[in-house]
Every structure is written in structure tokens, then in C-alpha cells.
């Protein structure tokens, strides 16, 4: 049976423990995701308190991180999602995504509606990927893929 969280507190506290143990043990997010059968981005989001993990994946990552059975159970609970408090984000990396949506949000909306019609792109039936690629002009570039199912608005 699935269980859900009433507040984000328990999962946030567990996320703090995950981050501390990950650093102590010298593990990467990829190390933790390997062998779960799940995407790196999904496992990372789950360990940061934004998704529930299937039992086998929860047991695997908990074992790697030295977490107890209560943590295994907590990793399987449906969280109260949303890791950014209200208002404009202050973390520079997160703010850049906010800025991107400020600049390109209306463009994305216009193009989605023109190509698909009235509706939304799901963040539930969704895949996220990030790749580091070399920039021909020097340095690196981040290629971020947001892959969500289109859900049309249904008149009623």
C-alpha cells in the first residue's frame, strides 16, 4: 500500500542525511542510481525528497548510504512535492532556470499551444535528462531535455 507525507519535513531531513552520507562515502548521484533500473534524474530527485522510490530501489540506495529500515520506508512514501519555498529563488543555479522561464516561458507556451493545442505538458508523465557536452568555442555546455506527455484541455 502506498503512503503519503503530510508535510515535507521528514523527507527534507532524510535528504539532509542522504547528502551527508553521500559526501562521507564519496558517492556520486550516478553511483546511487546505478543498479536501480531508474533514471539518474529520477533517483536524485527521489533522494532529495521529490519522488517515492520503488521498494527495491529504496533498499539498494539505503544500503549504499548506510540508512536504516525507517529510511527505506520513508523513501517509498509519496512526498509533499516542491523543494523551493515561495517567491523568487535565491540560489544562483536555480535562479537561472527561473530566469529562463521568465524569458522563454511565453514563447514555450505559444509554441506548445500552436503545435499541440490548448493543454499542458505533464510533469508527472515526464522524463528529465542532463548531459555535459563540449562547447566548440571552449568550455562545456549543458543539454537539458524536458520530455513530458502532452495533456489536452478537455471541455466539460
From Swiss-Prot:
**What SUPFAM superfamilies does this protein map onto?**
Cyanase C-terminal domain, lambda repressor-like DNA-binding domains
Q: What InterPro entries does this protein map onto?
A: Cyanase, Cyanate_lyase_C, Cyanate_lyase_C_sf, CYNS_N, Lambda_DNA-bd_dom_sf
The record's listing under SMART domains reads: Cyanate_lyase
Indicate the enzyme's highest-level EC class.
Answer: lyase
Enzyme Commission no = 4.2.1.104
Q: Which UniProt keywords apply?
A: Lyase
* Alphabetical GO biological process terms: cyanate metabolic process
Q: Which reaction does it catalyse?
A: cyanate + hydrogencarbonate + 3 H(+) = NH4(+) + 2 CO2
Q: Which Pfam families match?
A: Cyanate_lyase, CYNS_N
| An MF annotation (GO) of this entry | cyanate hydratase activity
Q: What domain of life does the UniProt record list for this protein's source?
A: Bacteria
Residues annotated as the enzyme's active site: 96, 99, 122
Record's family? Answer: Belongs to the cyanase family.
NCBIfam families membership: cynS, PRK02866.1
Q: What does this protein do?
A: Catalyzes the reaction of cyanate with bicarbonate to produce ammonia and carbon dioxide.
What is this protein's name? Cyanate hydratase
Q: Which organism is it from?
A: Pseudomonas paraeruginosa (strain DSM 24068 / PA7) (Pseudomonas aeruginosa (strain PA7))
Amino acid at each position: 500500500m502506498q503512503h503519503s507525507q503530510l508535510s515535507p519535513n521528514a523527507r527534507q531531513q532524510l535528504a539532509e542525511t542522504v547528502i551527508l552520507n553521500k559526501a562521507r562515502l564519496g558517492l556520486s548521484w550516478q553511483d546511487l542510481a546505478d543498479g536501480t533500473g531508474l533514471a539518474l534524474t529520477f533517483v536524485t530527485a527521489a533522494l532529495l525528497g521529490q519522488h517515492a522510490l520503488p521498494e527495491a530501489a529504496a533498499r539498494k540506495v539505503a544500503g549504499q548510504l548506510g540508512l536504516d529500515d525507517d529510511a527505506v520506508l520513508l523513501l517509498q512514501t509519496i512526498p509533499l512535492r516542491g523543494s523551493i519555498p515561495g517567491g523568487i529563488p535565491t540560489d544562483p543555479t536555480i535562479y537561472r532556470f527561473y530566469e529562463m522561464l521568465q524569458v522563454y516561458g511565453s514563447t514555450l507556451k505559444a509554441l506548445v499551444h500552436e503545435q499541440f493545442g490548448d493543454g499542458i505538458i505533464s510533469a508527472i508523465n515526464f522524463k528529465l535528462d542532463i548531459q555535459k557536452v563540449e562547447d566548440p568555442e571552449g568550455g562545456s555546455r549543458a543539454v537539458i531535455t524536458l520530455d513530458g506527455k502532452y495533456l489536452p484541455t478537455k471541455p466539460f
